[in-house]
């Protein structure tokens, strides 16, 4: 006898990326061969070998497809979270809109899982907290300091924002984190823990410390600073 495997389908997607926001726009940009790698400010990387990164464009630099957190997140709430959480909230809204999923009943809410991964979490907020503590003293820290950078709070904020009460997860497995989140979500559905799962990954780790650390590990491109679009060369023999 064959083993019956529960079928799982993707019904909605959302994205915040260096190519901009919105699945359709980003997909068309990829098909056109566009690169999202750009040069970083000299102030940030003056003494760091790598001068380029995949920076998410702001709504000011790209009025059509730039990142606009205020369209999704109240200004007061933004003060309580790192940028990676903002990315998750904006991408999640697009995915849920595309899927048409707005659980209203308690049963639907309890059967909706949230699994959002990150490799590092709120790196910038951690660094800011260290700076504040060193320069101004520990009493100057906000009560929201810890929640602002915890790796699991991307999933936490998304589930709270949409009223999900099902299983929650936050894989922290470096570069494999986003892929693991998708796998974990699929297993939750297949095992019967959930009927619906919102899953993915979010990262916002462009900071002098992270750039310097990865550069020290020789994990960043340093040969194409004047040609950012050529910096990502995964199959280049040199």
List the predicted regions and their residue ranges:
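ACP-dependent fatty acid/polyketide chain-elongation machinery
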Residues: 1-77
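Acyl-thioester C-C bond-transforming condensing/cleaving domain
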Residues: 2-5, 21, 32-42, 78, ...
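A glycine- and small-residue-enriched flexible loop/hinge segment at structural boundaries
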Residues: 43-101, 151-165
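Generic anion/oxyanion-binding catalytic loop in active/binding sites
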Residues: 15, 81, 171
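Generic hydrophobic secondary-structure packing signal
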Residues: 25, 29, 84-91, 177, ...
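Structured loops at beta-to-helix junctions and adjacent beta-edge loops in soluble globular domains
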Residues: 13, 117-119
